[in-house]
Amino acid sequence: MDSTPTSTDTLVIGGRQFRSRLFTGTGKYPNLALMQQSLDRSDCEMVTVAVRRVQTVAAGHAGLMEAIDWTKIWMLPNTAGCTTAEEAIRVARLGRELARLAGQEHNTFVKLEVIPDSRHLLPDPFGTLEAAEQLVKEGFTVLPYINADPLLAKRLEEVGCATVMPLGSPIGSGQGLRNASNIALIIENASVPVVVDAGIGVPSEASAALEMGADAVLVNSAIALAGNPPLMAEAMASAVRAGRQAFQAGRLPTRAQASPSSPTTGKVND
């Protein structure tokens, strides 16, 4: 994506502007109070909500919808827990209704997850593409969660997805950017925003994603499971801002040899 800095450096997804490039989740927090504090400290403007867990009032999700000020934060319903394209499409439709119930009448966003493997939680590329094609036809703003596959990312862009969301490493693993080279290829070839999702464990990894040109990151476990979630949320926000500024500034070229920082002429003994 374009690295030219602007005075109002906003991210645009599906025609909606976001000042914050840190997206967060709502799961895994010890309690809703810590979630609220963390969202506030993160300065995030979009959070994911697992539609199935809210609908079934799963553990930790009771009262979730009432705990968030939806006039300030944009809801990103996700299809977590769906194992097939058909299931994901159905849950996406429920998510759109959930957003409307929260007062976001025109919210068509969906984070598309199709994950048949409950052990490794790796997304199904075929099911994701199938579901994405149908949801785009239905007018959804689709943000698909994918393996860091440059060919799949481009195909999803071509069918009309609003972003692509390659994983840094498996969900909740905290392994960081294990797929950095592939993510770099996705960024280089993308004409839509690239959001690195999953695997980020510490702020330096979030910063690294932005430094390499990612447009945003989505971080949940690293905040929710930290010893002090609100403090970690603030640290992530600072790291994302720093990473974005570093990308805009442009890093010095990597060299095989040393390059002196002081002049080599005009020395005392010359």
Swiss-Prot record:
Any one of the GO CC terms: cytoplasm
This protein's UniProt keywords: Cytoplasm, Schiff base, Thiamine biosynthesis, Transferase
InterPro entries: Aldolase_TIM (IPR013785), Thiazole_synthase_ThiG (IPR033983), ThiG (IPR008867)
Enzyme Commission code(s) on record: 2.8.1.10
Annotated 1-deoxy-D-xylulose 5-phosphate binding sites: G172, A198, G199, N220, S221
GO molecular function: thiazole synthase activity
GO-annotated biological processes: thiamine diphosphate biosynthetic process
Source organism superkingdom: Bacteria
Record keyword Iron present: no
Cellular compartment(s): Cytoplasm
Biased composition (Polar residues): 256-270
Active site residues of this protein: K111 (schiff-base intermediate with dxp)
Catalytic activity: [ThiS sulfur-carrier protein]-C-terminal-Gly-aminoethanethioate + 2-iminoacetate + 1-deoxy-D-xylulose 5-phosphate = [ThiS sulfur-carrier protein]-C-terminal Gly-Gly + 2-[(2R,5Z)-2-carboxy-4-methylthiazol-5(2H)-ylidene]ethyl phosphate + 2 H2O + H(+)
Pathway the protein acts in: Cofactor biosynthesis; thiamine diphosphate biosynthesis
Residue segments, region Disordered: 249-270
Record note on quaternary structure: Homotetramer. Forms heterodimers with either ThiH or ThiS.
Family statement: Belongs to the ThiG family.
Function, in words: Catalyzes the rearrangement of 1-deoxy-D-xylulose 5-phosphate (DXP) to produce the thiazole phosphate moiety of thiamine. Sulfur is provided by the thiocarboxylate moiety of the carrier protein ThiS. In vitro, sulfur can be provided by H(2)S.
HAMAP family: ThiG
Name the UniProt record assigns to this protein: Thiazole synthase
Gene: thiG
